[in-house]
Amino acid sequence: MTQVTICGGGNLGHALAGWLAARKGLRVNVLLSGQERVSHWETGIAHQNGIMVIAPEETRCGRPELVTADPAKAVRGTRIILLALPAFLHQATLAKVAPFVDTGALVGAIPAHGGFQWSAERAFKGMATKPVIFGFRKSPWTCRVVTYGHSVRITGVRTSMEVSAEPTATVHETAEEISHLFDIALAPLPHFLHVTLSIGNQILHPGILYGRLRDWDGIPFAEAPLAYQGLSDVAAGILHNLSDESQAIGEAVVLKLPRLHLSPIRSLAEEMRTSAQALIEDASTLQTIIGTNRGLFGLRIPSMQVQGGWIPDSKSRYLAEDVPFGLCVLRGIAEIAGVTTPWIDEVLNWAQMQLGACYLRDGTMSGPDVKRSGAPQAFGLSTLSQLMHR
């Protein structure tokens, strides 16, 4: 019997708990952040003897063995620990579970952007425990909670995935072991920087908000603005520029660290086209890829209702996660690799003003809030050699 512990009770946490608990040979624990959440889960599970997972091809109901807010109870004896959490919760969660992790256990994040490998290194530094750290490049599912602690719906399923691991010599056996959990082919990546440098939400969300709101006059909107539909030429151009600079960062790392055998970094358009091909009506440009993706129809910029209408929520994950644990990571690597990024700088300067934070100061990643980000500078990393080695 293999014990798996899931850290997190959001959309992905629900899906993992129900899906994996329904599999034979797995004992599934769930670690939540407080007793109130535990009580909600226990009530929902008791109602139908598990967490209901409604997927396109089938419905499963799996009952976790244990739902708890106690990291010791959740983690002791666990073979595989899965963090299904926003990147800004990785460091705190790793610090809580680290004292109870067995040597040789697998500790990973889904997905593992935002400097996860550096957070894990910090959490286990100086400990006798030496786990294998792994990370998915993407999430295996698109999912949404139907009823908290009770049911979740999977709306999209990936047929293949990529995973990285440290020590790097363990990546093939790690990929093979993890693939059995999901019945999905897992391609091993030769280094964690493949995951860290992958283009996605870290430029999409801040770029969308900057393109939509940089000239906003502060007057509330009648309704929360659409995030993706009706994207202007200017906003699409900003995203294209951010994508180009992100690729340039990857190319510089590939050139300067040839031993890593990093694959070329795909553009934002290529990433979105690949991940949602069946949903896109017109894949000719980045603007049409975003605007005709049926999976994005109707999605709005996270907003708050105020007197007179709606205003954008600067505390939403579009900024609160994708800037410190997304854009800052790219900008930090760019600084180390010697790549200039005028568009990333422009968007980052605007975004940090919305957040009331300072990461980029006088053109360098030296602001006081860098220490609360996933940028390599937050971990004392200042050379490409340090990025390469755990």
Model-assigned labels for residue ranges:
Residues 1-54:
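NAD(P)+-binding Rossmann beta1-loop-alpha1 motif at the extreme N-terminus of oxidoreductases
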Residues 7, 15, 115, 169, ...:
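Conserved active-site and cofactor/substrate-binding residues in soluble primary-metabolism enzymes
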Residues 87-150:
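Rossmann-like NAD(P)(H) cofactor-binding subdomain of soluble oxidoreductases
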Residues 58-104, 108:
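Rossmann-like NAD(P)-binding element
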Residues 140-251, 373-389:
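Substrate/ligand-engaging "lid" and interaction regions
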Residues 185, 193-328, 337:
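C-terminal substrate-binding/catalytic lobe of Rossmann-fold NAD(P)-dependent dehydrogenases
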Residues 8, 32, 85, 111, ...:
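Short beta-strand/turn micro-motifs composed of small residues
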